[in-house]
Amino acid sequence: MSGNPDDDRLEELRQRKKEQLKQQQQGGDAEREAQQQQAQQAEQQKQAMLKQNLTDGARKRLNTIRMSKPEFAEQAEQQVLALAQSGRVQGRIDEDQMKEILRELKPDSQSFNINRR
C-alpha cells in the first residue's frame, strides 16, 4: 500500500471485520434455514395427524374454510389435534362431527333487526 504501518494495520483491521461480518451472516443464514426446516417438519407432522384423524369429507370442509378464513381453519385444526391427542375421539372425525366442532368454535354473531317506519 502506501508503506505507512498505520495504514497497513488499518487495512488489516478492515479485512478482519469484513470476514467476521461474513461469518456472522452465514451463521445467521444457517440458523434461519434450520428454523424453517423445523417449522416445515412440524407442519408435515400436523398434516399427517389431520389426514389420519379426518375423513375425506371433513378434510375438504376444513380446506374450504382455510381458503376464506385461514385463522379460523388453524383454530379448528388445533382443536381437532387436541381432541385426537387426548383420546376423546373414537375413530376418524367425519363431516358431521367437523360441522359440530366448527359450530362450537364459531364466535356468536349478533344479529340486528332494523325496523323501518
UniProtKB/Swiss-Prot annotation:
Gene3D superfamilies linked to this entry: PDCD5-like
InterPro entries on file: DNA_bind_arc, PDCD5-like, PDCD5-like_sf
UniProt entry keywords in alphabetical sequence: DNA-binding
Family to which this protein belongs: Belongs to the PDCD5 family.
Protein name, as recorded: DNA-binding protein VNG_2008H
Biased composition (Low complexity): 35-48
GO cellular component, one term: cytosol
Key word Transcription present: no
Start and end residues of each stretch annotated as Disordered: 1-59
Any GO MF annotation of the entry: DNA binding
Residue ranges, compositional bias (Basic and acidic residues): 11-21
Keyword field contains DNA-binding: yes
